[in-house]
């Protein structure tokens, strides 16, 4: 494929270097990972609100996650499109079966990371805070290694 230069000369079109394509692919993956991380945080908070107060409202969700009402409302709409929650205007938010599964998986992963960190001697308050960042970026293989290590240590 060719193009005409500003000098009126026909030149071959240069392709993007492979490295550039790899970076673009990495950025896209990072965006998808971040979207998944946010979905996990939101469904986990919704499940906690339902368990503790019997309902999850956008205002409570925003307060719990430290975001604005508008941000929480947009996230709920995104979760609805993903089939993780149901909601009606001015009503509570409910997790679908898929949303409940994701919330449980996220909570279990969080708890495992906290147990592993505390087993290493990290204070529980620090382990809780650190787990929030770590839990979304740990592979299944690493989580399995955490479980094996904790089993070796005993109950």
Residue ranges and their predicted role:
Residues 29-67:
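N-terminal helix-turn-helix DNA-binding core of bacterial DNA-binding proteins
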Residues 56-93:
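Canonical helix-turn-helix DNA-binding module
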Residues 8-31, 40-43:
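Short, amphipathic alpha-helical interface elements at domain boundaries
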Residues 106-141:
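Arg/Lys-rich, alpha-helical DNA-contact motif
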Residues 91-110:
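Basic, amphipathic "hinge/linker" alpha-helix immediately C-terminal to the N-terminal HTH DNA-binding motif
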Residues 1-19, 129-155:
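C-terminal regulatory/oligomerization modules of transcriptional regulators
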Residues 64, 102, 119:
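Residues within the alpha-helical elements of helix-turn-helix
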Residues 38-41, 57, 98, 109, ...:
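N-terminal positioning helix adjacent to the helix-turn-helix/winged-helix DNA-binding module
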């Amino acid at each position: 494929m060719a193009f005409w230069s500003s000098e009126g000369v026909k030149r071959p079109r240069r392709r993007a270097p492979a490295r550039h394509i790899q970076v673009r692919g990495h950025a896209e993956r990072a965006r998808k990972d971040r979207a998944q991380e946010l979905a996990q945080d939101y469904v986990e908070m919704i499940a906690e609100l339902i368990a503790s107060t019997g309902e999850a409202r956008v205002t409570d969700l925003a307060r719990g996650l430290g975001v604005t009402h508008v941000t929480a409302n947009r996230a709920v709409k995104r979760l609805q499109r993903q089939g993780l929650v149901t909601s009606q205007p001015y009503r509570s938010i409910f997790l679908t079966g898929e949303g409940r599964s994701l919330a449980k998986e996220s909570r279990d992963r969080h708890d495992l990371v906290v147990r592993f960190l505390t087993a290493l001697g990290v204070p529980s308050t620090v382990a809780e805070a650190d787990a929030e960042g770590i839990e979304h970026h740990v592979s299944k293989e690493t989580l399995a290694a955490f479980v094996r290590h904790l089993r070796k240590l005993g109950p």
